[in-house]
Amino acid sequence: RLIRRQRQMCIRDRHCGHGRQLYFTSYGKEFVNSTLAYLELCKDTRFQSPGLELLQRLFTDGVQWIFYSKQHDPNNAGRFISSNQYSSAIKTLAERIYKLSSSDVRNSMKQALQHISGDNSLTGNRMFWRFDYMVHRRNNYMTSSRMTSTRTVGNEAGNGDGEFNYYASNGVNYLFVTGREYNGNFFKIFNNRQYPGITAEQDNAPLPIPDWGEGGNNGNSFAGGVSDSLYGACGMMLDRHGLQGHKAWFYFDDEYVCLGTGIRNPEGK
């Protein structure tokens, strides 16, 4: 089940925009807001749409997984990279969907709304295979692996936003414990060659700008993972502008393991 609109697509558990790029907290939010306006208008009429079920699944199977202590995984923000810029607006969308929901799905939407609102009781592991993206959750932390391949694109740049997002495609591994790790000015002052978990050259050369996702993918098709809904493992073969490496993550209960090997750059310093 999916909805397409130009270069955007809403698939059961995720929203993507400008190619297969995680983009829920900005473009996806507006996509849902526009769709909800029509669903609310047609409520209790003969024009009611089955599209409501798709939005419910989007939140129960996807959106609630990326929130921790009212913060969202920055991987889902596209070029507007942030962990909290649109959190309150997304909570409002969840409330509107909840009000439209029938009794058979009302409880699952209520739980999704609670998790978006700061309840961290959602635990498990989920592999979003269409986007080379894994989320792992326990009561006391949330983490994610954002891989890329020839099929997917990392955080883009455009209209002057996201001009330092190039390395956001290199295997970012965000970790939330307090929920305050990446809010405030974090993305304005951090070293753009040191996104959490990435493999990148540490030099002063100008960064390529991934305008509208151009150059934001990976040169190797190998990226993905496996999950039994509680534990998971994922990995990618990095190949970008001569930089190569094998990256993998293994997710357990009180710990997870990040491994890197075969790192090389024949053209590097």
Regions picked out by a protein language model, each given a short descriptive name:
Residues 12-22:
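Acidic/His metal-coordination segments adjacent to aromatic residues that form catalytic metal sites
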Residues 31, 38-269:
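Extended polysaccharide-engagement surfaces of secreted carbohydrate-active enzymes
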Residues 26-33:
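Aromatic- and histidine-enriched alpha-helix N-cap/loop-to-helix transition segments
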Residues 1-7, 11:
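Single conserved hydrophobic/aromatic residue that forms the stacking wall/gate
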Residues 3, 15-16, 27, 41, ...:
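Broad hydrophobic/π-residue packing in well-ordered secondary structure
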Residues 8, 24-26:
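Aromatic-rich surface patch/π-platform used for binding flat ligands and interfaces
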